Amino acid sequence: MEVSRRKAPPRPPRPAAPLPLLAYLLALAAPGRGADEPVWRSEQAIGAIAASQEDGVFVASGSCLDQLDYSLEHSLSRLYRDQAGNCTEPVSLAPPARPRPGSSFSKLLLPYREGAAGLGGLLLTGWTFDRGACEVRPLGNLSRNSLRNGTEVVSCHPQGSTAGVVYRAGRNNRWYLAVAATYVLPEPETASRCNPAASDHDTAIALKDTEGRSLATQELGRLKLCEGAGSLHFVDAFLWNGSIYFPYYPYNYTSGAATGWPSMARIAQSTEVLFQGQASLDCGHGHPDGRRLLLSSSLVEALDVWAGVFSAAAGEGQERRSPTTTALCLFRMSEIQARAKRVSWDFKTAESHCKEGDQPERVQPIASSTLIHSDLTSVYGTVVMNRTVLFLGTGDGQLLKVILGENLTSNCPEVIYEIKEETPVFYKLVPDPVKNIYIYLTAGKEVRRIRVANCNKHKSCSECLTATDPHCGWCHSLQRCTFQGDCVHSENLENWLDISSGAKKCPKIQIIRSSKEKTTVTMVGSFSPRHSKCMVKNVDSSRELCQNKSQPNRTCTCSIPTRATYKDVSVVNVMFSFGSWNLSDRFNFTNCSSLKECPACVETGCAWCKSARRCIHPFTACDPSDYERNQEQCPVAVEKTSGGGRPKENKGNRTNQALQVFYIKSIEPQKVSTLGKSNVIVTGANFTRASNITMILKGTSTCDKDVIQVSHVLNDTHMKFSLPSSRKEMKDVCIQFDGGNCSSVGSLSYIALPHCSLIFPATTWISGGQNITMMGRNFDVIDNLIISHELKGNINVSEYCVATYCGFLAPSLKSSKVRTNVTVKLRVQDTYLDCGTLQYREDPRFTGYRVESEVDTELEVKIQKENDNFNISKKDIEITLFHGENGQLNCSFENITRNQDLTTILCKIKGIKTASTIANSSKKVRVKLGNLELYVEQESVPSTWYFLIVLPVLLVIVIFAAVGVTRHKSKELSRKQSQQLELLESELRKEIRDGFAELQMDKLDVVDSFGTVPFLDYKHFALRTFFPESGGFTHIFTEDMHNRDANDKNESLTALDALICNKSFLVTVIHTLEKQKNFSVKDRCLFASFLTIALQTKLVYLTSILEVLTRDLMEQCSNMQPKLMLRRTESVVEKLLTNWMSVCLSGFLRETVGEPFYLLVTTLNQKINKGPVDVITCKALYTLNEDWLLWQVPEFSTVALNVVFEKIPENESADVCRNISVNVLDCDTIGQAKEKIFQAFLSKNGSPYGLQLNEIGLELQMGTRQKELLDIDSSSVILEDGITKLNTIGHYEISNGSTIKVFKKIANFTSDVEYSDDHCHLILPDSEAFQDVQGKRHRGKHKFKVKEMYLTKLLSTKVAIHSVLEKLFRSIWSLPNSRAPFAIKYFFDFLDAQAENKKITDPDVVHIWKTNSLPLRFWVNILKNPQFVFDIKKTPHIDGCLSVIAQAFMDAFSLTEQQLGKEAPTNKLLYAKDIPTYKEEVKSYYKAIRDLPPLSSSEMEEFLTQESKKHENEFNEEVALTEIYKYIVKYFDEILNKLERERGLEEAQKQLLHVKVLFDEKKKCKWM
């Protein structure tokens, strides 16, 4: 692992010297141990973390990746790898043992290429998704698309391991990823899900090219596993001295055990995998089974040392753990490199095969630095000020700090942070790359930014510097131990001391007897300010004894003369001032004479007389004057060996005797809090025979042992110890008797203080006795549980506690007020911890009970009580039933049911013989609820029972009355139904007779002189066919092309035009686009239409493309169902075929089919308008479609009008006939009458009137009076619910021969009115159909309308248009002059040839292909959409009728025989008799085309060339090319990848890249 170190940011210029108050405030503001550290929390457990040198911190949790700023206070961006946009976490099998990282979706998180010249930083992420995919993204923002990605790079199993490192190698300095992963796991359910390709099944280490698009594996880029190697769990990957190292250990994922020793694999830092060997790592010292699990790894590069955390534990829980379970071991990299021989133990290469017995050499750690601990999880190492600093994470949420000595000797770790929740620390610790005083601590779902030292805990300069913490130093201006960055002007060496200075350089005030006549007060240390002041003051009298100023660059000194008057000075205050800060000290001379040692005497400011060996007042003299000047000159005392400290090792007979006599059995408790324990009991034998008994506690191997004297030997088998406070850890315990060997007791765990998370229930009754449960952790170290009440004080409560649970009975507070709150407290040693609040409320109130007996051997007792908030459980309640004189039965609690008013408690008494007797006897019920005991009164008979007696009598009376009323109503209903049936029969007879008569007698006079057929020009015909649903393209494609310069086409479009004329390229692009999931059916149709327009003048080339794509489509369909080919428009070629047919058949459509088609539409319109048409719904009496049948029609009649047209400037011709007779219906609205009048004018004069419908009005001429006719006016009928009925001719009572004047409106014109649901015409609202809206003679008419009565109208309409329809059909499937259109003949021959090539012998297949390509794909589209061909407006009703005609047309081409019954839809039945005739004609049509002589290629090319010339400059081809490029650039990477894989398209690939450059430059120019 490579750790970058940045220089500290430039500091601001030095300000003026701050005041002492400011220095004090700065000291308060500096962060301390208790400050809240910033925490970032995720939704799921964190699986990976990395810090970038410039772009913040990256954290992977579940399926999410977050980018945070360095302070963890702001989230910069987030990436969701789950398609649903959730941060899900893996649902793994049984949770793995804690010494190993658990399941995670994230496998790699590697920032790289940071700071490279001219290159931006990148982030490589590896996930289990998509078979172990890796992505490369820019470091700046995760939301940007990935630059490169590849599959099968990392392990795709959430439990599997992955380690990797990115480096540069080769001549071109390309970036490579060396990755080691557990690609295959033994679990069958996961193996089938995401195993890699067979060639990668035994891959252990792979080399990937990160600059390739798919992160492809190098040709020599795999290192394989030996057959018997099993699964390897890789922990880390790092670079050192030109090699890549992978620490790992063999691991059985099924059993959860390590199957071999941890090892280190080594490969060369090269462009291919060059295996350089492996070496085993032995960190098993101090553990009987060895430590075979490798938990964490860190390379201390500056020291060329690798640190690892090893573990022997294989399961969860303290019962599987011991004080020696884990260890920190340091290995010299040079030794690992020397011993990593190329043995084939776990890995095989091409040169060497796996050999049994060829074991790797074992490397031993640096013994002095090995640190043994009970529960380490992670390590990170670095070098600060030439000191090696190691940070260690633990399983109980601690962050430890170890500082190695000169010989790499580990000191006792310092706890620099503890997680309150005790979450295990993540296996990877990450330093802050910007500020090296921080480290990121990850645990569970949280990341914290922690300061790397607690400098402020050192209160003095000497304490600060003797702690040897390289992060800390003494700040003179603040008089505190701080980080250098927290000290003002720390760059000034006079203001800052680090550990290299040593404690001797700390500033210190000393009082020295310089001579017999005077005493000197001075300051020693490394501090030499330019100017200083000093002053000595008598504290008792506030008198100054001395005051002085220093000479430049010299320390101030104060001389006090030796006077008899100064003997009474007991306390002096000495102060040195240095401009911005002061140094002061107080000396007390009261006890000088009591001090017996020279160092202690001189330290307090007293004077030591050498010859007399006594301590005196400093302002008096020795006799003779033989005092020591300072502490350094005191004689060195020889230390005596004390009884404490380390236990003596006595190997004499006493030891052997102790081993034979004394016996240790157990220690209780085995867990104590960090506060210690005053009564720990050790059990065994023969304790009273020993005189000196000590307990020795040994925790972390590099820390001092605790030696504790026995407190009290209780008897021969029990003794008591009082344990001191300690940090959280597990310790070995042994007992030493009389200086003999230490007998092991086992282990003892120091754990954190208890923590409460829940009290349930939180409300109880005042009498107490309810079972209360507390949830939390570390409850097994509680001494007492106390209820604290404001009146009753502290109440000790009996409790039962385990680690996470504590139960107790709520005490009674009966004498207190009814509603009160108490505090639950936990006592640990002499410390009280608040656990929460317990609410007391008044006792429950019981209202009664009842006893029921459904079975003779069982009684049910139901007790009612008032509703309350007590959560009563089965353990809280006891119910007893007393019956007879002495009978007593216990009732078993069943459940409690809470109702709206009362709560019911149900209990049952089972196994009795006389249940019914007991239920009817005298009885009472006793309820004991905790401490509450009471008798419940039996429920009284409610008054409702009397009501239940009267109820049956009333019920009988009501029933008889109801029967009488019902019979009367039934008779009335039968009479009305008979009348209605008679009326309905009469109506049916009339309608059937009228329908029959109309069918036989009706005749439609088709107007043949319909004038010129209003054909659309080719341009609009083509666009409506190409884009039936996209009207927005009409304008951009039809701009004036004649004024455009042909040479004006820009270079990018010219290049693209040339590129799509490359057939292989274009076909490849189309196939690639169709494989994209988000390339929808709409996109395919649009792309085909854009391509048709772009190649409109290159129809020969377009036809060749159509041929290739059709053949490819045949290849796809021939393997599945060939009859389905071309049936739907789901591919580009199908829409392309539609467009091609439209282009090639446009002339045939205009010359042959257009006129009969227009005649059909006109005839159909005439027939529809002959009968009533509802304006609102567009339904009509005469129709071909049952869904559009107006069967709610009233009686109607024809009204002949004499219409007079006003002379207008738009139509002043003298030849125009202005008096016209027009027939309308009395049920027509005024708007419908206008349309018929306009149509009559057009038919009479051959030209339109000159105005639009909304520009004219109608006036009824009544003598000298006129009345304007409107659809809605003041006389309109308003129905219920505010619905307005539109005015009709009948509404105005206009009779035959009435004169109507057509005039031009003067007011502003309005567009055609779209009537809302608030209006109606012929179809009335349901509630109105029962009312008489047209007079009494029509009463009830609407009520009995039946749809089937009017089905003959469908047949009548069919007969009216039949001859016109057949003329149209035969114009389509006939061959004028015995010649088929070129396009049809060519494509049908093409289909015949392809069928023959593919050996398709079924003639039905070819018939279906032809039907799908011509009638279905072209003619049906035209028949249903006349507005594609003519300049007319298609109404919804016409659309419904044309759908029936189009269906009949397609049925004529179908090969299946129609099996129609009486229940078949009318749309099918209408042309059922005609279809067989049509089918025969179609077969003859197909045969005639096939029998025609084939077209030569030159004929077809000539035809296509002529068609191309016809349509030159019809469309704006540049727009089409631009739209095509949008699709190409959207899927640019996919197209480019496809071109790379296809042979022969290298030139096309270059052209495509050139086109993209041209378009990109054009885009840049637009912004300039």
Curated annotation (Swiss-Prot):
One of the Pfam families matching this protein, by short name: TIG
Coiled coil: none
Signal sequence extent: 1-34
GO molecular-function term, one example from the UniProt record: semaphorin receptor activity
Keywords for the protein's UniProt record, in alphabetical order: Disulfide bond, Glycoprotein, Membrane, Phosphoprotein, Receptor, Signal, Transmembrane, Transmembrane helix
Organism domain of life: Eukaryota
GO BP annotations, alphabetical order: cell adhesion; negative regulation of cell adhesion; positive regulation of axonogenesis; regulation of cell migration; regulation of cell shape; regulation of synapse pruning; semaphorin-plexin signaling pathway; synapse assembly
Disulfide bond entries: C64-C87, C156-C194, C226-C354, C283-C329, C455-C472, C461-C506, C464-C481, C475-C487
Extracellular topological domain residue ranges: 35-944
Cited InterPro entries: Ig-like_fold (IPR013783), IPT_dom (IPR002909), Plexin (IPR031148), Plexin-C1_Sema (IPR041853), Plexin_cytoplasmic_RasGAP_dom (IPR013548), Plexin_RBD (IPR046800), Plexin_repeat (IPR002165), PSI (IPR016201)
Transmembrane segments: 945-965
Annotated positions of the Phosphoserine modification: S978
The keyword Signal is assigned to this record: yes
Annotated compartments: Membrane
Matching PROSITE patterns: SEMA
Entry membrane topology: Single-pass type I membrane protein
Topological domains, Cytoplasmic: 966-1568
Gene3D superfamilies noted in UniProt: GTPase Activation - p120gap, domain 1, Immunoglobulins, ligand-binding face of the semaphorins, domain 2, Phosphatidylinositol 3-kinase Catalytic Subunit, Chain A, domain 1, YVTN repeat-like/Quinoprotein amine dehydrogenase
Modified how: N-glycosylated.
Tissue: Detected in heart, brain, lung, spleen and placenta.
Annotated PANTHER family: PLEXIN, PLEXIN-C1
Quaternary state and interactors: Monomer. Homodimer. Interacts with SEMA7A.
Family the entry assigns: Belongs to the plexin family.
General function of this protein: Receptor for SEMA7A, for smallpox semaphorin A39R, vaccinia virus semaphorin A39R and for herpesvirus Sema protein. Binding of semaphorins triggers cellular responses leading to the rearrangement of the cytoskeleton and to secretion of IL6 and IL8.
Protein known as: Plexin-C1
Annotated gene: PLXNC1
